[in-house]
Amino acid sequence: MRTEYCGQLRLSHVGQQVTLCGWVNRRRDLGSLIFIDMRDREGIVQVFFDPDRADALKLASELRNEFCIQVTGTVRARDAKNVNADMATGEIEVLASSLTIINRADSLPLDANHVNTEEARLKYRYLDLRRPEMAQRLKTRAKITSLVRRFMDDHGFLDIETPMLTKATPEGARDYLVPSRVHKGKFYALPQSPQLFKQLLMMSGFDRYYQIVKCFRDEDLRADRQPEFTQIDVETSFMTAPQVREVMEALVRHLWLEVKGVDLGDFPVMTFAEAERRYGSDKPDLRNPMELVDVADLLKSVEFAVFAGPANDPKGRVAALRVPGGAQLSRKQIDDYGNFVKIYGAKGLAYIKVNERAKGLDGINSPVAKFLTADIVEAILERTGAQDGDMIFFGADNNKVVADALGALRLKLGKDLSLTDEDKWAPLWVIDFPMFEDDGEGGLTAMHHPFTAPRDMTASELKTAPEGAVANAYDMVINGYEVGGGSVRIHNGEMQQTVFGILGINEQEQREKFGFLLDALKYGTPPHAGLAFGLDRLTMLLTGTDNIRDVIAFPKTTAAACLMTEAPSFANLAALTELGIQVVKKAENN
Protein backbone atom coordinates (compact mmCIF):
# COMPACT_ATOMS: atom_id res chain seq x y z
CA MET A 1 0.00 0.00 0.00
CA ARG A 2 2.97 2.35 0.52
CA THR A 3 6.23 2.96 -1.28
CA GLU A 4 7.91 5.15 1.36
CA TYR A 5 7.58 6.19 5.00
CA CYS A 6 6.57 9.81 5.58
CA GLY A 7 9.47 10.57 7.89
CA GLN A 8 12.10 9.15 5.55
CA LEU A 9 11.51 11.45 2.57
CA ARG A 10 14.45 13.72 1.73
CA LEU A 11 15.76 15.91 -1.12
CA SER A 12 17.00 12.74 -2.82
CA HIS A 13 13.33 11.82 -3.44
CA VAL A 14 12.50 15.06 -5.29
CA GLY A 15 10.68 14.33 -8.54
CA GLN A 16 9.64 10.85 -7.48
CA GLN A 17 6.05 9.69 -7.22
CA VAL A 18 5.42 8.14 -3.81
CA THR A 19 2.53 6.50 -2.01
CA LEU A 20 2.28 7.16 1.71
CA CYS A 21 0.09 5.63 4.42
CA GLY A 22 -0.45 7.15 7.83
CA TRP A 23 -2.48 9.60 9.88
CA VAL A 24 -3.43 13.26 9.69
CA ASN A 25 -1.38 14.99 12.35
CA ARG A 26 -2.63 18.50 11.53
CA ARG A 27 -4.69 20.15 8.79
CA ARG A 28 -4.59 23.75 7.51
CA ASP A 29 -7.30 24.85 5.06
CA LEU A 30 -6.40 27.97 3.05
CA GLY A 31 -9.38 27.67 0.72
CA SER A 32 -7.73 27.04 -2.61
CA LEU A 33 -4.96 25.05 -0.93
CA ILE A 34 -5.10 22.49 1.87
CA PHE A 35 -1.99 21.48 3.78
CA ILE A 36 -1.72 18.50 6.08
CA ASP A 37 1.08 17.16 8.23
CA MET A 38 0.96 13.43 7.56
CA ARG A 39 2.48 11.12 10.16
CA ASP A 40 3.64 7.53 10.39
CA ARG A 41 6.04 5.75 12.71
CA GLU A 42 9.09 7.33 11.04
CA GLY A 43 7.96 10.94 11.33
CA ILE A 44 5.97 13.71 9.64
CA VAL A 45 5.91 15.17 6.14
CA GLN A 46 3.93 18.07 4.72
CA VAL A 47 1.40 17.15 2.01
CA PHE A 48 -0.57 19.75 0.06
CA PHE A 49 -3.59 19.61 -2.22
CA ASP A 50 -4.11 22.20 -4.99
CA PRO A 51 -7.02 23.09 -7.34
CA ASP A 52 -5.42 21.25 -10.29
CA ARG A 53 -6.35 17.99 -8.56
CA ALA A 54 -9.93 18.91 -7.76
CA ASP A 55 -11.11 15.48 -6.60
CA ALA A 56 -8.26 15.11 -4.13
CA LEU A 57 -8.72 18.70 -2.91
CA LYS A 58 -12.44 18.18 -2.34
CA LEU A 59 -11.86 14.99 -0.37
CA ALA A 60 -9.06 16.65 1.61
CA SER A 61 -11.57 19.21 2.90
CA GLU A 62 -13.16 16.37 4.89
CA LEU A 63 -9.93 15.43 6.64
CA ARG A 64 -9.62 15.80 10.41
CA ASN A 65 -6.92 14.88 12.91
CA GLU A 66 -6.13 11.15 13.17
CA PHE A 67 -7.98 10.13 9.99
CA CYS A 68 -6.11 7.12 8.57
CA ILE A 69 -5.28 7.91 4.93
CA GLN A 70 -3.34 6.91 1.84
CA VAL A 71 -1.80 9.62 -0.36
CA THR A 72 -0.10 9.34 -3.73
CA GLY A 73 1.84 12.34 -4.97
CA THR A 74 5.10 13.85 -6.17
CA VAL A 75 7.94 14.93 -3.89
CA ARG A 76 8.93 18.57 -4.42
CA ALA A 77 11.65 20.75 -2.93
CA ARG A 78 10.36 23.62 -0.82
CA ASP A 79 11.26 27.21 -1.63
CA ALA A 80 14.13 28.40 0.55
CA LYS A 81 11.82 30.72 2.50
CA ASN A 82 9.49 27.80 3.31
CA VAL A 83 12.13 25.35 4.53
CA ASN A 84 11.30 24.11 8.05
CA ALA A 85 14.58 23.45 9.85
CA ASP A 86 12.71 21.88 12.78
CA MET A 87 11.50 18.95 10.66
CA ALA A 88 13.68 16.14 9.30
CA THR A 89 11.56 16.39 6.13
CA GLY A 90 11.50 20.18 6.23
CA GLU A 91 13.26 20.68 2.88
CA ILE A 92 10.57 18.87 0.88
CA GLU A 93 6.81 18.47 0.59
CA VAL A 94 4.47 16.16 -1.31
CA LEU A 95 2.02 17.47 -3.94
CA ALA A 96 -0.90 15.05 -3.66
CA SER A 97 -2.50 13.66 -6.80
CA SER A 98 -4.85 11.20 -5.09
CA LEU A 99 -6.24 10.67 -1.61
CA THR A 100 -7.96 7.69 -0.01
CA ILE A 101 -9.60 7.95 3.39
CA ILE A 102 -9.00 4.50 4.84
CA ASN A 103 -10.74 5.19 8.15
CA ARG A 104 -12.25 8.24 9.80
CA ALA A 105 -11.70 9.15 13.45
CA ASP A 106 -14.29 10.19 16.00
CA SER A 107 -13.76 13.21 18.24
CA LEU A 108 -10.51 12.46 20.07
CA PRO A 109 -10.37 11.84 23.84
CA LEU A 110 -6.76 13.11 23.90
CA ASP A 111 -5.85 16.69 23.06
CA ALA A 112 -2.69 17.02 20.98
CA ASN A 113 -2.37 20.70 21.91
CA HIS A 114 -2.37 20.19 25.67
CA VAL A 115 -0.71 17.97 28.26
CA ASN A 116 -3.05 15.06 28.88
CA THR A 117 -3.32 13.34 32.26
CA GLU A 118 -1.42 10.09 32.58
CA GLU A 119 -4.72 8.36 33.37
CA ALA A 120 -6.16 9.47 30.02
CA ARG A 121 -2.96 8.52 28.20
CA LEU A 122 -3.04 5.01 29.65
CA LYS A 123 -6.76 4.53 28.98
CA TYR A 124 -6.33 5.50 25.31
CA ARG A 125 -2.82 4.13 24.99
CA TYR A 126 -3.24 3.25 21.30
CA LEU A 127 -3.73 6.99 20.62
CA ASP A 128 -0.96 8.06 22.99
CA LEU A 129 1.50 5.78 21.18
CA ARG A 130 0.84 7.64 17.93
CA ARG A 131 2.65 10.67 19.34
CA PRO A 132 6.08 11.01 17.70
CA GLU A 133 7.94 11.14 21.02
CA MET A 134 6.29 7.91 22.18
CA ALA A 135 6.93 6.20 18.85
CA GLN A 136 10.58 7.25 19.04
CA ARG A 137 10.97 5.73 22.51
CA LEU A 138 9.61 2.37 21.40
CA LYS A 139 11.80 2.46 18.29
CA THR A 140 14.80 3.10 20.53
CA ARG A 141 13.77 0.17 22.72
CA ALA A 142 13.62 -2.06 19.63
CA LYS A 143 17.08 -0.85 18.61
CA ILE A 144 18.45 -1.63 22.07
CA THR A 145 17.15 -5.21 22.02
CA SER A 146 18.56 -5.69 18.52
CA LEU A 147 21.97 -4.38 19.61
CA VAL A 148 21.93 -6.62 22.69
CA ARG A 149 21.15 -9.72 20.64
CA ARG A 150 23.91 -9.01 18.12
CA PHE A 151 26.45 -8.27 20.86
CA MET A 152 25.60 -11.40 22.83
CA ASP A 153 25.64 -13.57 19.70
CA ASP A 154 29.05 -12.13 18.77
CA HIS A 155 30.38 -13.00 22.24
CA GLY A 156 29.28 -16.63 22.15
CA PHE A 157 26.13 -16.41 24.26
CA LEU A 158 23.18 -18.69 23.48
CA ASP A 159 19.62 -17.37 23.60
CA ILE A 160 17.74 -20.06 25.56
CA GLU A 161 14.16 -19.76 26.80
CA THR A 162 13.15 -20.76 30.32
CA PRO A 163 9.66 -21.65 31.62
CA MET A 164 6.98 -19.09 32.43
CA LEU A 165 4.94 -21.56 34.49
CA THR A 166 7.20 -22.63 37.31
CA LYS A 167 7.39 -23.28 41.05
CA ALA A 168 7.06 -20.62 43.73
CA THR A 169 10.42 -19.90 45.37
CA PRO A 170 11.23 -17.16 47.88
CA GLU A 171 13.06 -14.40 45.99
CA GLY A 172 12.05 -11.35 47.99
CA ALA A 173 8.65 -10.42 46.56
CA ARG A 174 5.28 -12.13 46.32
CA ASP A 175 4.68 -14.41 43.35
CA TYR A 176 1.87 -14.15 40.85
CA LEU A 177 0.14 -17.53 41.13
CA VAL A 178 -1.54 -19.43 38.29
CA PRO A 179 -4.00 -22.20 39.26
CA SER A 180 -3.69 -25.60 37.61
CA ARG A 181 -6.87 -27.08 36.14
CA VAL A 182 -5.32 -30.54 35.85
CA HIS A 183 -3.79 -30.59 39.33
CA LYS A 184 -6.63 -29.26 41.47
CA GLY A 185 -5.53 -27.14 44.40
CA LYS A 186 -2.03 -26.66 43.03
CA PHE A 187 -0.54 -23.49 41.56
CA TYR A 188 2.23 -22.46 39.24
CA ALA A 189 4.11 -19.23 39.87
CA LEU A 190 5.11 -16.73 37.22
CA PRO A 191 8.88 -16.23 37.52
CA GLN A 192 10.32 -13.27 39.38
CA SER A 193 13.44 -14.06 37.37
CA PRO A 194 14.86 -17.10 35.55
CA GLN A 195 17.45 -17.37 38.36
CA LEU A 196 17.36 -21.07 39.12
CA PHE A 197 16.75 -22.17 35.54
CA LYS A 198 19.75 -20.23 34.27
CA GLN A 199 21.89 -21.79 37.00
CA LEU A 200 20.60 -25.20 35.95
CA LEU A 201 21.59 -24.36 32.36
CA MET A 202 25.14 -23.79 33.61
CA MET A 203 25.01 -27.22 35.26
CA SER A 204 23.81 -28.55 31.90
CA GLY A 205 26.95 -27.31 30.14
CA PHE A 206 25.62 -24.20 28.34
CA ASP A 207 28.36 -21.95 29.62
CA ARG A 208 27.13 -18.66 28.13
CA TYR A 209 23.39 -18.00 28.28
CA TYR A 210 21.27 -14.93 27.73
CA GLN A 211 17.59 -14.18 27.34
CA ILE A 212 15.44 -11.08 26.99
CA VAL A 213 12.65 -12.21 29.25
CA LYS A 214 9.48 -11.10 31.03
CA CYS A 215 9.53 -11.29 34.84
CA PHE A 216 6.74 -10.79 37.36
CA ARG A 217 6.67 -9.48 40.92
CA ASP A 218 3.56 -8.88 43.00
CA GLU A 219 4.99 -6.09 45.11
CA ASP A 220 4.08 -2.60 46.24
CA LEU A 221 4.84 -0.45 43.23
CA ARG A 222 6.89 2.73 42.93
CA ALA A 223 7.10 5.16 40.06
CA ASP A 224 9.95 3.18 38.45
CA ARG A 225 8.51 -0.31 39.05
CA GLN A 226 6.03 -2.45 37.12
CA PRO A 227 4.39 -5.76 38.09
CA GLU A 228 5.68 -7.23 34.82
CA PHE A 229 9.02 -6.07 33.51
CA THR A 230 11.71 -7.16 31.07
CA GLN A 231 15.20 -8.35 31.94
CA ILE A 232 18.29 -8.86 29.85
CA ASP A 233 19.26 -12.03 31.70
CA VAL A 234 22.82 -13.38 31.55
CA GLU A 235 24.69 -16.31 33.09
CA THR A 236 28.19 -17.69 32.52
CA SER A 237 30.33 -20.61 33.66
CA PHE A 238 34.07 -20.57 34.35
CA MET A 239 34.22 -16.76 34.51
CA THR A 240 35.24 -14.69 37.52
CA ALA A 241 33.26 -11.69 38.75
CA PRO A 242 35.71 -9.21 37.15
CA GLN A 243 35.46 -11.09 33.84
CA VAL A 244 31.65 -10.96 33.92
CA ARG A 245 31.76 -7.25 34.71
CA GLU A 246 34.19 -6.66 31.84
CA VAL A 247 31.86 -8.23 29.25
CA MET A 248 28.70 -6.59 30.63
CA GLU A 249 30.42 -3.20 30.81
CA ALA A 250 31.42 -3.61 27.17
CA LEU A 251 27.78 -4.31 26.31
CA VAL A 252 26.51 -1.17 28.02
CA ARG A 253 29.28 0.97 26.53
CA HIS A 254 28.28 -0.42 23.12
CA LEU A 255 24.63 0.55 23.72
CA TRP A 256 25.49 4.12 24.72
CA LEU A 257 27.83 4.55 21.76
CA GLU A 258 25.31 3.23 19.23
CA VAL A 259 22.20 4.89 20.67
CA LYS A 260 23.58 8.14 22.11
CA GLY A 261 26.93 8.52 20.39
CA VAL A 262 28.52 8.71 23.86
CA ASP A 263 31.67 6.89 25.00
CA LEU A 264 31.13 6.10 28.68
CA GLY A 265 34.78 5.18 29.20
CA ASP A 266 35.93 2.74 31.87
CA PHE A 267 33.57 2.31 34.81
CA PRO A 268 35.03 3.03 38.26
CA VAL A 269 34.57 0.32 40.88
CA MET A 270 33.47 1.16 44.42
CA THR A 271 32.69 -1.04 47.40
CA PHE A 272 29.27 -0.96 49.04
CA ALA A 273 30.87 0.34 52.24
CA GLU A 274 32.55 3.24 50.41
CA ALA A 275 29.38 4.14 48.52
CA GLU A 276 27.33 4.25 51.73
CA ARG A 277 30.04 6.20 53.56
CA ARG A 278 30.63 8.82 50.86
CA TYR A 279 27.19 9.11 49.29
CA GLY A 280 24.69 7.54 51.69
CA SER A 281 23.51 5.18 48.97
CA ASP A 282 24.43 1.88 47.33
CA LYS A 283 23.51 3.44 43.98
CA PRO A 284 25.28 6.80 44.10
CA ASP A 285 24.69 9.48 41.50
CA LEU A 286 28.25 10.61 40.75
CA ARG A 287 27.04 13.59 38.73
CA ASN A 288 26.42 15.24 42.09
CA PRO A 289 29.71 16.57 43.55
CA MET A 290 28.64 16.54 47.22
CA GLU A 291 29.91 13.87 49.61
CA LEU A 292 29.24 12.85 53.20
CA VAL A 293 32.24 13.45 55.47
CA ASP A 294 32.64 11.70 58.83
CA VAL A 295 33.23 14.10 61.73
CA ALA A 296 32.34 11.96 64.77
CA ASP A 297 35.94 11.97 66.02
CA LEU A 298 35.82 15.79 66.21
CA LEU A 299 32.62 15.88 68.26
CA LYS A 300 33.03 13.21 70.94
CA SER A 301 33.69 15.72 73.71
CA VAL A 302 31.13 18.42 72.86
CA GLU A 303 28.41 19.16 75.42
CA PHE A 304 25.67 18.53 72.90
CA ALA A 305 24.10 15.10 73.27
CA VAL A 306 22.71 15.09 69.72
CA PHE A 307 26.31 15.00 68.45
CA ALA A 308 28.19 13.42 71.37
CA GLY A 309 25.81 10.46 71.75
CA PRO A 310 26.22 9.00 68.25
CA ALA A 311 29.87 10.11 68.14
CA ASN A 312 30.65 7.86 71.11
CA ASP A 313 28.37 4.99 70.04
CA PRO A 314 30.10 2.19 68.06
CA LYS A 315 26.91 1.88 65.98
CA GLY A 316 26.46 5.63 65.67
CA ARG A 317 27.64 8.10 63.10
CA VAL A 318 28.00 11.86 62.74
CA ALA A 319 28.51 13.04 59.17
CA ALA A 320 28.63 16.42 57.46
CA LEU A 321 27.39 17.39 54.01
CA ARG A 322 28.93 20.53 52.51
CA VAL A 323 26.59 22.33 50.12
CA PRO A 324 28.45 24.73 47.78
CA GLY A 325 26.68 28.10 47.82
CA GLY A 326 24.19 26.78 50.36
CA ALA A 327 24.50 29.77 52.70
CA GLN A 328 21.94 31.49 50.47
CA LEU A 329 19.22 29.16 51.74
CA SER A 330 16.47 30.89 53.71
CA ARG A 331 15.34 29.79 57.16
CA LYS A 332 12.14 28.41 55.64
CA GLN A 333 14.12 26.36 53.12
CA ILE A 334 16.33 25.01 55.91
CA ASP A 335 13.23 24.08 57.93
CA ASP A 336 11.76 22.36 54.87
CA TYR A 337 14.93 20.30 54.46
CA GLY A 338 14.79 19.49 58.17
CA ASN A 339 11.29 18.10 57.70
CA PHE A 340 12.45 16.23 54.61
CA VAL A 341 15.16 14.26 56.46
CA LYS A 342 12.64 13.28 59.14
CA ILE A 343 11.01 11.08 56.48
CA TYR A 344 14.17 8.97 56.68
CA GLY A 345 14.25 8.74 60.47
CA ALA A 346 16.40 11.78 61.28
CA LYS A 347 15.31 13.84 64.27
CA GLY A 348 16.38 17.14 62.76
CA LEU A 349 19.02 18.93 60.72
CA ALA A 350 21.80 20.87 62.41
CA TYR A 351 23.77 23.23 60.19
CA ILE A 352 26.59 25.73 59.88
CA LYS A 353 26.39 28.67 57.48
CA VAL A 354 29.88 29.67 56.39
CA ASN A 355 29.87 33.43 55.90
CA GLU A 356 33.59 34.25 56.21
CA ARG A 357 35.80 31.18 56.38
CA ALA A 358 38.87 33.06 57.56
CA LYS A 359 37.12 34.29 60.74
CA GLY A 360 36.54 30.78 62.07
CA LEU A 361 33.89 30.68 64.81
CA ASP A 362 33.07 34.36 64.26
CA GLY A 363 32.50 33.79 60.55
CA ILE A 364 29.73 31.23 60.88
CA ASN A 365 26.05 31.25 61.69
CA SER A 366 24.74 28.12 63.41
CA PRO A 367 22.18 27.14 66.05
CA VAL A 368 24.76 24.73 67.51
CA ALA A 369 27.69 27.18 67.50
CA LYS A 370 27.44 27.64 71.29
CA PHE A 371 28.42 23.98 71.74
CA LEU A 372 31.47 24.20 69.47
CA THR A 373 34.94 25.55 70.16
CA ALA A 374 36.91 27.54 67.62
CA ASP A 375 39.25 24.57 67.13
CA ILE A 376 36.36 22.19 66.44
CA VAL A 377 34.77 24.59 63.96
CA GLU A 378 38.10 25.06 62.20
CA ALA A 379 38.61 21.30 62.02
CA ILE A 380 35.11 20.78 60.55
CA LEU A 381 35.61 23.54 57.98
CA GLU A 382 39.01 22.15 57.06
CA ARG A 383 37.82 18.55 56.72
CA THR A 384 34.77 19.42 54.64
CA GLY A 385 36.68 21.88 52.44
CA ALA A 386 34.18 24.64 53.22
CA GLN A 387 34.42 28.00 51.48
CA ASP A 388 32.70 31.34 51.97
CA GLY A 389 29.02 31.03 51.09
CA ASP A 390 28.78 27.29 51.78
CA MET A 391 26.36 25.47 54.05
CA ILE A 392 27.23 22.40 56.12
CA PHE A 393 24.40 20.10 57.17
CA PHE A 394 24.88 17.42 59.83
CA GLY A 395 23.41 13.97 60.35
CA ALA A 396 23.80 12.36 63.78
CA ASP A 397 22.17 9.02 64.58
CA ASN A 398 22.78 5.34 63.86
CA ASN A 399 24.63 4.46 60.66
CA LYS A 400 21.51 3.64 58.64
CA VAL A 401 19.56 6.77 59.53
CA VAL A 402 22.52 9.05 58.78
CA ALA A 403 23.22 7.38 55.43
CA ASP A 404 19.56 7.32 54.39
CA ALA A 405 18.78 10.88 55.50
CA LEU A 406 21.90 12.65 54.24
CA GLY A 407 21.97 10.49 51.11
CA ALA A 408 18.43 11.56 50.22
CA LEU A 409 19.17 15.18 51.17
CA ARG A 410 22.24 15.13 48.93
CA LEU A 411 20.13 14.10 45.94
CA LYS A 412 17.41 16.66 46.69
CA LEU A 413 19.86 19.52 47.14
CA GLY A 414 21.70 18.50 43.99
CA LYS A 415 18.48 18.89 42.04
CA ASP A 416 17.08 21.93 43.87
CA LEU A 417 20.31 23.94 43.61
CA SER A 418 21.30 22.66 40.14
CA LEU A 419 24.49 21.12 41.51
CA THR A 420 23.93 17.83 39.67
CA ASP A 421 25.31 17.92 36.13
CA GLU A 422 22.30 16.77 34.10
CA ASP A 423 24.37 16.63 30.88
CA LYS A 424 26.83 14.09 32.25
CA TRP A 425 26.86 10.29 32.30
CA ALA A 426 28.29 8.76 35.48
CA PRO A 427 28.44 4.94 35.48
CA LEU A 428 30.11 2.78 38.11
CA TRP A 429 30.19 -0.70 39.60
CA VAL A 430 29.30 -1.21 43.26
CA ILE A 431 30.76 -4.42 44.72
CA ASP A 432 31.22 -6.27 48.01
CA PHE A 433 27.72 -5.99 49.38
CA PRO A 434 26.87 -7.49 52.76
CA MET A 435 25.73 -11.09 52.33
CA PHE A 436 22.85 -10.64 54.76
CA GLU A 437 20.87 -7.88 56.42
CA ASP A 438 18.69 -7.71 59.51
CA ASP A 439 15.11 -8.73 58.79
CA GLY A 440 13.81 -6.61 61.69
CA GLU A 441 12.62 -9.67 63.61
CA GLY A 442 15.91 -10.92 65.00
CA GLY A 443 16.84 -12.95 61.94
CA LEU A 444 18.73 -12.43 58.70
CA THR A 445 17.58 -12.09 55.11
CA ALA A 446 19.62 -12.29 51.91
CA MET A 447 20.56 -8.85 50.63
CA HIS A 448 20.44 -10.09 47.03
CA HIS A 449 19.07 -13.64 46.87
CA PRO A 450 19.85 -16.96 48.60
CA PHE A 451 21.98 -18.25 45.71
CA THR A 452 24.74 -15.61 45.96
CA ALA A 453 28.15 -16.89 47.04
CA PRO A 454 30.17 -15.24 49.81
CA ARG A 455 33.65 -13.90 49.17
CA ASP A 456 36.53 -15.96 50.53
CA MET A 457 34.60 -17.97 53.14
CA THR A 458 34.04 -21.66 53.71
CA ALA A 459 30.63 -22.99 54.68
CA SER A 460 31.76 -23.50 58.29
CA GLU A 461 33.19 -19.97 58.50
CA LEU A 462 29.96 -18.55 57.11
CA LYS A 463 27.88 -20.53 59.60
CA THR A 464 30.01 -19.22 62.47
CA ALA A 465 29.94 -15.52 61.50
CA PRO A 466 27.20 -14.77 58.94
CA GLU A 467 26.72 -11.13 60.02
CA GLY A 468 30.09 -10.06 58.67
CA ALA A 469 29.97 -12.04 55.43
CA VAL A 470 30.60 -10.16 52.19
CA ALA A 471 28.72 -11.27 49.08
CA ASN A 472 30.55 -11.78 45.79
CA ALA A 473 27.96 -9.50 44.20
CA TYR A 474 28.04 -6.47 41.93
CA ASP A 475 25.59 -3.81 40.75
CA MET A 476 25.93 -1.52 37.75
CA VAL A 477 24.77 2.01 38.52
CA ILE A 478 24.30 4.86 36.03
CA ASN A 479 23.30 8.36 37.16
CA GLY A 480 21.92 7.04 40.43
CA TYR A 481 19.88 4.23 38.85
CA GLU A 482 20.68 0.58 39.44
CA VAL A 483 20.48 -0.71 35.86
CA GLY A 484 21.80 -4.19 36.52
CA GLY A 485 22.88 -6.50 39.28
CA GLY A 486 24.45 -9.90 39.63
CA SER A 487 26.76 -12.15 41.57
CA VAL A 488 28.89 -15.24 41.65
CA ARG A 489 26.56 -18.13 42.50
CA ILE A 490 26.91 -20.88 45.05
CA HIS A 491 28.07 -24.03 43.26
CA ASN A 492 28.55 -26.22 46.31
CA GLY A 493 25.73 -28.12 48.05
CA GLU A 494 27.11 -27.68 51.56
CA MET A 495 27.41 -23.92 51.10
CA GLN A 496 23.90 -23.68 49.65
CA GLN A 497 22.39 -25.58 52.56
CA THR A 498 24.36 -23.44 55.01
CA VAL A 499 22.92 -20.26 53.49
CA PHE A 500 19.41 -21.71 53.59
CA GLY A 501 19.93 -22.56 57.26
CA ILE A 502 21.11 -19.04 58.10
CA LEU A 503 17.96 -17.71 56.44
CA GLY A 504 15.80 -19.91 58.66
CA ILE A 505 14.86 -22.43 55.96
CA ASN A 506 14.87 -25.84 57.63
CA GLU A 507 15.93 -29.06 55.90
CA GLN A 508 12.38 -30.18 55.18
CA GLU A 509 11.52 -26.83 53.57
CA GLN A 510 14.80 -26.92 51.63
CA ARG A 511 13.81 -30.25 50.11
CA GLU A 512 10.25 -29.11 49.36
CA LYS A 513 11.23 -25.85 47.67
CA PHE A 514 14.74 -26.45 46.38
CA GLY A 515 15.20 -30.22 46.23
CA PHE A 516 15.82 -30.12 42.48
CA LEU A 517 18.60 -27.53 42.95
CA LEU A 518 20.25 -29.39 45.82
CA ASP A 519 20.17 -32.58 43.75
CA ALA A 520 21.69 -30.82 40.73
CA LEU A 521 24.54 -29.49 42.89
CA LYS A 522 25.66 -33.11 43.49
CA TYR A 523 26.69 -33.74 39.90
CA GLY A 524 29.78 -31.74 39.02
CA THR A 525 28.43 -28.19 39.11
CA PRO A 526 30.76 -25.64 37.46
CA PRO A 527 31.53 -22.28 39.06
CA HIS A 528 29.14 -19.78 37.54
CA ALA A 529 28.16 -16.14 37.74
CA GLY A 530 25.69 -13.85 36.05
CA LEU A 531 23.81 -10.62 35.92
CA ALA A 532 20.47 -9.19 34.86
CA PHE A 533 19.78 -5.75 33.40
CA GLY A 534 16.43 -4.02 33.60
CA LEU A 535 15.63 -3.34 29.94
CA ASP A 536 12.89 -0.88 30.88
CA ARG A 537 15.24 1.18 33.04
CA LEU A 538 18.06 1.10 30.47
CA THR A 539 15.63 2.34 27.83
CA MET A 540 14.35 5.03 30.18
CA LEU A 541 17.89 6.39 30.59
CA LEU A 542 18.72 6.15 26.89
CA THR A 543 15.53 7.98 25.86
CA GLY A 544 15.85 10.72 28.47
CA THR A 545 12.55 10.17 30.28
CA ASP A 546 12.12 9.82 34.03
CA ASN A 547 8.95 7.73 33.77
CA ILE A 548 9.37 4.02 33.14
CA ARG A 549 5.83 3.81 31.72
CA ASP A 550 7.00 5.97 28.80
CA VAL A 551 9.17 3.13 27.45
CA ILE A 552 6.65 0.27 27.81
CA ALA A 553 3.99 -0.08 25.13
CA PHE A 554 1.16 -1.07 27.45
CA PRO A 555 2.21 -0.46 31.07
CA LYS A 556 0.29 -0.87 34.30
CA THR A 557 -0.52 1.90 36.77
CA THR A 558 1.11 2.10 40.21
CA ALA A 559 -1.92 0.09 41.37
CA ALA A 560 -0.92 -2.72 38.94
CA ALA A 561 -3.99 -2.10 36.76
CA CYS A 562 -4.40 -1.69 32.99
CA LEU A 563 -6.77 1.23 32.45
CA MET A 564 -7.25 0.34 28.79
CA THR A 565 -8.34 -3.30 29.14
CA GLU A 566 -9.55 -2.91 32.74
CA ALA A 567 -7.37 -5.79 33.91
CA PRO A 568 -7.41 -7.37 36.41
CA SER A 569 -11.05 -8.41 36.17
CA PHE A 570 -13.36 -10.90 37.82
CA ALA A 571 -13.35 -14.44 36.44
CA ASN A 572 -16.65 -16.08 35.60
CA LEU A 573 -18.02 -18.71 37.96
CA ALA A 574 -17.68 -21.57 35.46
CA ALA A 575 -13.97 -20.94 35.01
CA LEU A 576 -13.41 -20.76 38.77
CA THR A 577 -15.39 -23.95 39.34
CA GLU A 578 -13.33 -25.80 36.73
CA LEU A 579 -10.18 -24.68 38.52
CA GLY A 580 -11.55 -25.67 41.92
CA ILE A 581 -11.36 -22.10 43.20
CA GLN A 582 -13.87 -20.32 45.40
CA VAL A 583 -13.56 -16.55 45.88
CA VAL A 584 -14.01 -15.39 49.46
CA LYS A 585 -15.74 -12.03 49.60
CA LYS A 586 -14.83 -9.54 52.30
CA ALA A 587 -17.67 -8.77 54.69
CA GLU A 588 -19.04 -5.28 54.14
CA ASN A 589 -18.99 -2.85 57.05
CA ASN A 590 -22.45 -2.16 58.45
From Swiss-Prot:
L-aspartate binds at E171, R217, H448, R489. The keyword Phosphoprotein does not apply. GO terms for molecular function: aspartate-tRNA ligase activity; ATP binding; nucleic acid binding. CDD domains: AspRS_core (cd00777), EcAspRS_like_N (cd04317). InterPro entries: Aa-tRNA-synt_II, aa-tRNA-synth_II, aa-tRNA-synth_II/BPL/LPL, Asp-tRNA-ligase_1, Asp-tRNA-ligase_1_N, Asp/Asn-tRNA-synth_IIb, AspRS_core, GAD-like_sf. The keyword Protein biosynthesis applies. It comes from the Bacteria. Its main location: cytoplasm. Residues 195-198 are annotated as: Aspartate. Keywords: Aminoacyl-tRNA synthetase, ATP-binding, Cytoplasm, Ligase, Nucleotide-binding, Protein biosynthesis. One of its GO terms (cellular component) is cytoplasm. Pfam families: GAD (PF02938), tRNA-synt_2 (PF00152), tRNA_anti-codon (PF01336). GO terms for biological process: aspartyl-tRNA aminoacylation. Its EC number is 6.1.1.12. It catalyses: tRNA(Asp) + L-aspartate + ATP = L-aspartyl-tRNA(Asp) + AMP + diphosphate. ATP binds at R217, D218, E219, Q226, E482, G534, L535, D536, R537. It is an enzyme of class 6 (ligase). It is found in: Cytoplasm. Homodimer. Belongs to the class-II aminoacyl-tRNA synthetase family. Type 1 subfamily. NCBIfam families: aspS_bact, PRK00476.1. Catalyzes the attachment of L-aspartate to tRNA(Asp) in a two-step reaction: L-aspartate is first activated by ATP to form Asp-AMP and then transferred to the acceptor end of tRNA(Asp). This is Aspartate--tRNA ligase. It comes from Salmonella typhimurium (strain LT2 / SGSC1412 / ATCC 700720). The gene is aspS.
